[in-house]
């Protein structure tokens, strides 16, 4: 376990990745300025509002959308807690939010990347795959995050959770490009990470003199919201897309009429991300002081009012994770998170502590980062869980109690369903045959050979005799798991002839005499099967 920890050999180990400055909507990663746009682009995006028709052609498709897992692989229940290795609460809170991001978790659990990756050491996707797999498949346990997750970022003191979050997302995006070093910006935006978290801003400037229009498209992985004048996330989004007037000293130099003229600038979301990361700007860039105010955020958020195209229906997102900072400054305090497991239950993930929570408690936090997923995506993953598609962390035994044998054959070939079916059928046949044989034997007897008085006369005084139901007719009152337990017990319990072996009884009486003074009133239970 020490090899996987953040803290090794008395010092922090990190040197794999360079620190990333958090992304902002106005960061011009790629610009496309034109008055006329191409008819069609092969960039794969959601067809929800034909969001990619106006973007530049793509030289290479790095992660086709059809390769994303279509069914859920995540266990329905909550996973493991994370050990704090010393000022790493910001790491743990961020990792938990990523772990419970359905599209990312499903891809990681499919192990598709690690099967084709040729540089496992230093690859953030491989590192995150190992972490997410361990976290989701170890419910009730506490695990240590790998040292490679914070390599190049952690300096032994508390850092900003949002910066670490985007550092990790960006490192995963770069890991998608090992064999595609020389690709254009638009091809890079077809990676797996961009398909999950990414979209495009459209900054449109309209000249009020000649009515010429210039569009600039910038990719995003998160959305930063100014909350100083906002009481809710919706108000912050409205302020973000509010048209801005450009005049006077800020007048626009139009490329159409070739003169400085007043103009209006509007920022809208041109493409909708599968998963939205909304960052509430709570910390001052200068002093680091925190804006400790309550900002309301909904469980369901309609993003359609903030999109470039307004002629379509609602675009509903549902909340699935919240990252919270408790404290008065970005330099101190504590980070924790709330996540929604695939079963629908909310949990508070506070380092090693994992406790059930409610949506009321989740919505009352002073949130720092909000995670939303498209409602259609969440429902699709939830439906697959209800059909029993997720692998169980506790192994095949636990799975076979929750899924039918047909489901195991269809959805879990790794569980070797045919052998499991044969074993269960054989076991059921043995149990049925034994009961039937005992019933026939009992019918042919005029008087039972075995009765309570004979047993009590030969057993030591400190043995309490418990008789099991002869034909298990009382089993119908038990729960299914109790019935299964009793069946297993009856199959492994020796017959009464073996239990009444003379040597065994002599040994019991000898042990009873030796311990008589020590355990005068104790009783030992002996299960007798008839």
Swiss-Prot record:
<feature type="region of interest" description="Disordered">
    <location>
        <begin position="382"/>
        <end position="412"/>
    </location>
</feature>
<dbReference type="GO" id="GO:0016579">
    <property type="term" value="P:protein deubiquitination"/>
</dbReference>
<comment type="function">
    <text>Deubiquitinating enzyme that removes conjugated ubiquitin from specific proteins to regulate different cellular processes that may include cell proliferation, progression through the cell cycle, apoptosis, cell migration, and the cellular response to viral infection.</text>
</comment>
<protein>
    <recommendedName>
        <fullName>Ubiquitin carboxyl-terminal hydrolase 17-like protein 22</fullName>
        <ecNumber>3.4.19.12</ecNumber>
    </recommendedName>
</protein>
<keyword id="KW-0378">Hydrolase</keyword>
<keyword id="KW-0645">Protease</keyword>
<dbReference type="GO" id="GO:0031647">
    <property type="term" value="P:regulation of protein stability"/>
</dbReference>
<dbReference type="GO" id="GO:0005829">
    <property type="term" value="C:cytosol"/>
</dbReference>
<dbReference type="GO" id="GO:0005634">
    <property type="term" value="C:nucleus"/>
</dbReference>
<feature type="compositionally biased region" description="Polar residues">
    <location>
        <begin position="496"/>
        <end position="505"/>
    </location>
</feature>
<dbReference type="InterPro" id="IPR028889">
    <property type="entry name" value="USP_dom"/>
</dbReference>
<feature type="compositionally biased region" description="Basic and acidic residues">
    <location>
        <begin position="382"/>
        <end position="392"/>
    </location>
</feature>
<dbReference type="GO" id="GO:0042981">
    <property type="term" value="P:regulation of apoptotic process"/>
</dbReference>
<dbReference type="GO" id="GO:0005783">
    <property type="term" value="C:endoplasmic reticulum"/>
</dbReference>
<dbReference type="Pfam" id="PF00443">
    <property type="entry name" value="UCH"/>
</dbReference>
<comment type="similarity">
    <text>Belongs to the peptidase C19 family. USP17 subfamily.</text>
</comment>
<dbReference type="InterPro" id="IPR001394">
    <property type="entry name" value="Peptidase_C19_UCH"/>
</dbReference>
<feature type="active site" description="Proton acceptor">
    <location>
        <position position="334"/>
    </location>
</feature>
<keyword id="KW-0539">Nucleus</keyword>
<feature type="region of interest" description="Disordered">
    <location>
        <begin position="476"/>
        <end position="530"/>
    </location>
</feature>
<feature type="compositionally biased region" description="Basic and acidic residues">
    <location>
        <begin position="398"/>
        <end position="412"/>
    </location>
</feature>
<dbReference type="InterPro" id="IPR006861">
    <property type="entry name" value="HABP4_PAIRBP1-bd"/>
</dbReference>
<feature type="active site" description="Nucleophile">
    <location>
        <position position="89"/>
    </location>
</feature>
<dbReference type="GO" id="GO:0006508">
    <property type="term" value="P:proteolysis"/>
</dbReference>
<keyword id="KW-0788">Thiol protease</keyword>
<keyword id="KW-0833">Ubl conjugation pathway</keyword>
<feature type="compositionally biased region" description="Basic residues">
    <location>
        <begin position="510"/>
        <end position="524"/>
    </location>
</feature>
<dbReference type="Pfam" id="PF04774">
    <property type="entry name" value="HABP4_PAI-RBP1"/>
</dbReference>
<dbReference type="InterPro" id="IPR038765">
    <property type="entry name" value="Papain-like_cys_pep_sf"/>
</dbReference>
<dbReference type="GO" id="GO:0004843">
    <property type="term" value="F:cysteine-type deubiquitinase activity"/>
</dbReference>
<dbReference type="InterPro" id="IPR018200">
    <property type="entry name" value="USP_CS"/>
</dbReference>
<feature type="compositionally biased region" description="Low complexity">
    <location>
        <begin position="484"/>
        <end position="495"/>
    </location>
</feature>
<keyword id="KW-0256">Endoplasmic reticulum</keyword>
<feature type="domain" description="USP">
    <location>
        <begin position="80"/>
        <end position="375"/>
    </location>
</feature>
<dbReference type="InterPro" id="IPR050164">
    <property type="entry name" value="Peptidase_C19"/>
</dbReference>
